[in-house]
Every structure is written in structure tokens, then in C-alpha cells.
Amino acid sequence: MRHYEIVFMVHPDQSEQVPGMIERYTATITGAQGTIHRLEDWGRRQLAYPINKLHKAHYVLLNVEAPQEAIDELETNFRFNDAVIRSMVMRVKHAVTEASPMVKAKDERRERREDFAEAGDDVDAGDSEE
């Protein structure tokens, strides 16, 4: 079996359906004896350019190891699902399991916010003691 990186973009009005879509697509892969190495839901993000007069889309990234039949079925599902506005399936040489730069940047921002909040609490505590 080969390794693939799959990214698909969902219409922003259909964001509520994304968990069900992810479940359906992962079931397709695991049902064909494939494995999912990484699954990231990037959420709703700004597009670089409008697609079908849309400026935002909901992004999902999958890194999988699956047979060609499962990938063909996924591509067919993407093509006939009107909620999926773009998809890309790319073959990669190795399984990728570490977090993508998108998730790493998000985690770093969260850590900075937490550090800032803690620093703000320390300053507030110092003011109340005087």
C-alpha cells in the first residue's frame, strides 16, 4: 500500500457536516485495510483567491496508507459531494505523523496567549497587595 496526503476544502456553510464527512472518509480507508497516520481539522480559513464566489473554506488534512481502490473511491466521493469545493490527493514516500506547520503555529499562539494571561494575572495580583 502507498502513502497519501489528502487535503479537501468544504463549503463554509457546510462546516457542521465536516465531522460526519471525516468519519465517512476515514471509514472508507479503514474498511479497505488502510491506516490513518494523521488527521487534522484546520477549521474555517481564508482562501488565497475566491472559489465560486467564496472567500473562506473549511480545511481538512489526512495522511493515510491505503490501497488504490480506496483512494479512487475517496476521489469519487469528493467529486460528487457538492459541499467539497476542492480536493487534492498526493502520493508521498513516507508516512507523515508529526503535526503540520498549521497546527504547530496554532499551538504556539495558544501557548503565547496562556503565557500572556498568566503574566497578566501576576501583574493584577501585585496591584491588589499594595
Curated annotation (Swiss-Prot):
Superkingdom classification of source: Bacteria
Region spans: Disordered: 100-130
GO-annotated cellular components: cytosolic small ribosomal subunit
Biased amino acid composition, Basic and acidic residues: 104-116
Record-level Gene Ontology MF annotations: small ribosomal subunit rRNA binding; structural constituent of ribosome
Pfam families: Ribosomal_S6 (PF01250)
SUPFAM superfamilies, alphabetized: Ribosomal protein S6
Signal sequence segment: none
GO biological processes: translation
Keywords on record: Ribonucleoprotein, Ribosomal protein, RNA-binding, rRNA-binding
Spans traversing the lipid bilayer: none
Alphabetized CDD domains for the sequence: bS6
Biased composition (Acidic residues): 117-130
Role noted for this protein: Binds together with bS18 to 16S ribosomal RNA.
Protein family according to the UniProt entry: Belongs to the bacterial ribosomal protein bS6 family.
Protein name, per record: Small ribosomal subunit protein bS6
Species lineage: Bacteria, Pseudomonadati, Pseudomonadota, Gammaproteobacteria, Enterobacterales
